[in-house]
C-alpha cells in the first residue's frame, strides 16, 4: 500500500496538499483564538470562538497528522535520519504538551498572562514545526 503512495504520480502530491490544508486550518484557527485572547475583537466571546475554532483546529490537526503519517510510511528510514524531521517531531511533542498545559489549567477561563504566554509559545512552536516541515526536503 505505501509503495503505491510513493510510486503513484498523484498520491504523494495529493497527501502534501491535504497536509498543507490541514496545517492551514489548524494554524488559522489557533491564530484567531490567540488574537482574541490578546484583546482583538473584544465583542466576540472567547468561549464561542474557542468552541468553533478549536473544533476546526482539531479537524486540521487530524488531516495533517493522517496525511503526515502516510507520507512518513513511504520513506521512514530516510525521515528518521533527517534532522529537520527529528526536530519537527520534538516540536510537535512540545506543542502538544503546551496545549495540554493550556487546557488543563483552564486558561480559556482565566485569560491571564500565563494564558497569553502559553499561546505565544504555541504560535512560536507551530512556526518552528512548519519551518522544519519545509526543511525536510532539503
What do these predicted regions represent?
Residues 1-138:
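Polytopic transmembrane helical bundles with strong interfacial aromatic enrichment
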Amino acid at each position: 500500500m505505501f509503495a503505491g503512495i510513493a510510486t503513484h504520480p498523484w498520491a504523494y502530491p495529493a497527501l502534501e496538499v491535504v497536509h498543507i490544508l490541514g496545517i492551514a486550518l489548524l494554524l488559522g484557527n489557533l491564530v484567531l483564538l490567540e488574537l482574541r485572547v490578546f484583546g482583538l475583537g473584544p465583542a466576540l466571546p472567547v468561549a464561542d470562538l474557542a468552541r468553533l475554532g478549536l473544533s476546526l483546529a482539531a479537524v486540521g490537526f487530524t488531516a495533517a497528522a493522517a496525511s503526515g503519517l502516510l507520507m512518513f510510511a513511504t520513506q521512514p528510514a530516510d525521515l528518521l535520519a533527517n534532522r529537520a524531521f527529528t526536530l519537527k517531531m520534538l516540536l510537535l511533542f512540545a506543542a502538544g504538551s503546551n496545549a495540554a498545559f493550556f487546557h488543563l489549567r483552564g486558561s480559556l477561563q482565566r485569560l491571564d498572562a500565563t494564558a497569553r504566554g502559553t499561546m505565544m509559545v504555541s504560535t512560536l512552536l507551530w512556526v518552528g514545526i512548519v519551518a522544519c516541515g519545509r526543511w525536510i526536503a532539503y
